[in-house]
Amino acid sequence: MANVIEYTVNAYLSNIRTVLLFSLSFLVAILIPIFAAFPTYSDMGGIFVRTASELLNLNVVSFSIIIASIFFSLVFLSFAIVAINIITKHERTHVRIKKEVFEGLERYTSRVFAVLLLFTVLLSLFDLLLYVSHAPTFIYYLLVLLITPFFFYAPSSVVIDDSRVLHAMRMSVKFLVKRFDYFLLWLAIAAVALSIFDGLFILISPTIVSTYIMLVFNAVFVLPFLVLLQSQMYLKRFAMLKR
């Protein structure tokens, strides 16, 4: 597993300018919920949406604004994820990145958008149904845990395998189950990175300002690295790239 981290760090540093350029899409995707008057809250450098408890009380205009904002946020998020995965594919398979960008970017982005949209809809439905039924909170997290394997590596499969949405979801669950250790490693690195930087920003400036600075930092530096790591892990399914 150590070489996965090594490949990720090397790819991140050697393509830092390109990564930072594409990370602007992550930043836009994260900022849209804030400026669209979402019922949101921030924690550990992330934006979280209060869905069921708030959406049921919205009027038509507010609801329409939120739906449109989610749509555009997912578009920017999809573009950024695809771009980072293209960098990984270029680094490890020596595919010409310009050809990939011009010929596959729109197709990949639309498929990844479909994956993210489906995941978002399912999360919202779970939240809404559990809120209405007054079910215990742990059931929501259990449902999220059950569907996550179908979505975790799906964006990587879309770009690396040129998969369609359903096939990408099948490949995602297949690889996650086969290499569950990679999934645990990714979670551990994400948790440690977010915790460390969150703590540092609180120490530097223990105010609401540090929360928004952390959001920007995560979007520009941390999130691209985690997507790159995820993509590098998925590439391990190819025997010729296991070294």
Q: Predicted segment positions?
A:
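Hydrophobic alpha-helical membrane segments
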Residues: 1-243
